[in-house]
Regions:
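Conserved active-site-proximal loop/helix segments of enzymes involved in bacterial cell-wall
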Residues: 132-161, 197-199, 238-297, 301-302, ...
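Active-site beta-strand/loop architecture of penicillin-binding DD-peptidases
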Residues: 214-256, 261-269, 293-384
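Extracytoplasmic/secreted envelope proteins and their assembly/folding machinery
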Residues: 54-58, 97, 154-161, 166-170, ...
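Extracytoplasmic/periplasmic proteins that interact with beta-lactams or build/remodel peptidoglycan
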Residues: 1-72, 91, 265-270, 386-392
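Active-site-adjacent helix/loop patches that line small-molecule binding or acyl-intermediate pockets
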Residues: 66-77, 113, 126-139, 147-204, ...
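Active-site SXXK
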Residues: 57, 79, 100-132, 160, ...
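A short, polar/charged loop-to-alpha-helix boundary motif
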Residues: 89-102
Length: 397
C-alpha cells in the first residue's frame, strides 16, 4: 500500500470511529461501541478502560447514589483513561456522557491554574502572607480592599490553598497577575482547547476577565462561567503529578481489522510542557497539604498507614451550585503517585457529585476509596520494598 493511501485509510478510520463514538454520546448509550463498519469491512476498537476498576467504581456509586456522579481515573504516564463512569440516581443507571460533558462550573478547582501562574510568574510563594476580612468562602468587593480593620486576619498562601480561601486568591490575583496572564495559563492547562482526538469533547471554557473584581472571581473559581469536564478535572491534577507536563487524555488503544486482526491505527501520545518542574513540585506540596490538613483531611484520615506511606497523595476540592444538570457540585481532583518510582507515575482521579436536595457522600471520600482499591487490587505496591519516606525516617534515627 502506498504511503498516501495508508494515510488516507488512517484518516478515514479515525473519522468513522469518532462518528460512532459521538453517536454513542448523542443517544446517551451506556457503553462505547466495540465494532465499527468501515467501507465493506468491520474493525474492532480496543479501549484503555480497566474492567475491574470500573466495576468497583460502579459498585460504590450504586452504594451511595448521589443524584449525579462522575468518576474519572487517568494513568499519569500515558494519559490513558482507565475509567470514566457517569451515574444518575433517578434511573439508577450508568452512562458514558456525563464524564465527557463540559457543562460544569469548575469552582475552586481553578485555583490550581491560578496558583500555577502566581508561583511561576510572580513573587508569591507558599509562605507569602495575605490579610483578609470576612469569611474565606465568600467574595465581596469590600473584602478585596486593603482597609485596616480590627477584624482583619492573616493567612499564608499555603493555608489559603489548603482551605480554599476565595478572598486571598482574589487579592493575590489583583496584585500579582493580569487577566491576560491568567487566560494564557488556563490555555496551557487545556482550557479553550480540543483535548481529545477520538471524541468531540466540548472545550472547557475560560473567559478573559475585564475588571479587577472579575479577575478575582475567575482566579478564585467563584463564578459560574468557567466550565470544565470531569475528564479535564483529572487532567489538571495529572499535569501537577507529571512535574508540569500535560499528557493529553486518550481512550482508544488501537483499531484493528476484524478478520486479519491487523492493527490499522493506534493513537500517538501527545504532550506539552505547562509548568517548570520547580513550580509543579510546589503545587504538589500544596495539594498534599490540602489532603493532610486542609479541606479534604477528613476523607483521608483513616487511610491505611502502610498504603499512605507508599504514596504521595494531593488534591483540590471545590463546590458550587449551577451547571447542567443543575445542582450543587462537589468536586475533588487528585493524584496518587507511588513514592517508589519503580511503580510508575501513578494515577489522577476526578470525582464530581451533583446533589439536588440531599448530600449523600463526599467526592473526596469516593476518590480515597478508588485510590485504595487501585493500589491494593489493580497495581499493588510491593510491601517488601521500603519506601523513600521510610528511608528518610531511618536516616533521621
Amino acid at each position: 500500500m502506498k504511503k498516501e493511501e495508508r494515510r488516507e485509510e488512517i484518516i478515514t478510520t479515525r473519522s468513522l470511529v469518532k462518528e460512532n463514538l459521538n453517536e454513542a454520546f448523542k443517544f446517551s448509550k451506556k457503553t462505547f461501541p466495540k465494532k465499527v463498519d468501515l467501507k465493506e469491512e468491520q474493525v474492532d476498537i480496543k479501549y484503555s478502560f480497566n474492567e475491574d476498576l470500573t466495576a468497583y467504581i460502579k459498585k460504590i456509586l450504586k452504594r451511595y447514589r448521589s443524584d449525579y456522579s462522575s468518576v474519572i481515573v487517568i494513568d499519569n504516564e500515558t494519559g490513558y483513561i482507565l475509567s470514566a463512569v457517569g451515574y444518575e440516581r433517578k434511573d439508577n443507571q450508568f452512562n458514558i456522557t456525563l464524564p465527557f460533558s463540559s457543562t460544569h462550573p469548575s469552582a475552586s478547582l481553578f485555583k490550581i491554574v491560578t496558583t500555577a501562574d502566581l508561583l511561576e510568574k510572580s513573587e508569591v510563594t507558599k509562605d507569602s502572607v495575605f490579610k483578609f476580612r470576612g469569611r474565606g468562602t465568600t467574595l465581596y468587593k469590600y473584602q478585596l480592599k486593603d482597609k485596616k480593620s480590627r477584624w482583619q486576619r492573616r493567612q499564608s498562601f499555603e493555608r489559603a490553598f489548603a482551605y480554599s480561601n476565595n478572598v486571598i486568591f482574589g487579592k493575590a490575583a489583583i496584585k500579582n497577575t493580569t487577566g491576560e496572564r491568567l487566560f494564557d495559563m488556563a490555555a496551557d492547562f487545556g482550557f479553550n482547547e480540543k483535548l481529545m482526538e477520538e471524541i468531540s469533547l466540548s472545550k472547557s471554557v475560560f473567559e478573559m476577565p475585564d475588571t479587577d473584581y472579575e479577575l478575582a472571581e475567575k482566579a478564585s473559581g467563584f463564578n459560574k462561567k468557567t466550565m470544565i469536564s470531569p475528564i479535564h478535572a483529572a487532567v489538571m491534577a495529572s499535569v501537577v503529578a507529571n512535574d508540569g507536563v500535560l499528557n493529553y487524555p486518550r481512550v482508544v488503544t488501537e483499531i484493528s481489522d476484524n478478520v486479519t486482526k491487523k492493527v490499522i491505527w493506534s493513537p500517538q501520545q501527545r504532550t506539552k510542557r505547562v509548568l517548570e518542574v520547580p513550580t509543579a513540585r510546589e503545587l504538589q506540596e500544596l495539594m498534599e497539604v490540602t489532603v493532610k490538613r486542609g479541606t479534604a483531611r477528613g476523607s483521608f484520615r483513616r487511610v491505611n498507614r502502610k498504603l499512605l506511606n507508599g504514596l504521595e497523595i494531593g488534591g483540590k476540592t471545590g463546590s458550587i451550585t449551577g451547571g447542567i444538570p443543575f445542582g450543587k457540585r462537589d468536586w475533588f481532583t487528585s493524584f496518587a503517585v507511588p513514592v517508589n518510582k519503580n511503580h510508575g507515575k501513578g494515577i489522577s482521579i476526578a470525582v464530581m457529585n451533583i446533589n439536588l436536595e440531599k448530600w449523600y457522600v463526599k467526592s473526596s471520600y469516593l476518590a480515597r476509596k478508588v485510590i485504595e482499591y487501585y493500589y491494593k487490587e489493580v497495581n499493588p505496591l510491593n510491601d517488601n520494598v521500603s519506601t523513600a519516606k521510610e528511608a528518610e525516617s531511618d536516616k533521621d534515627t
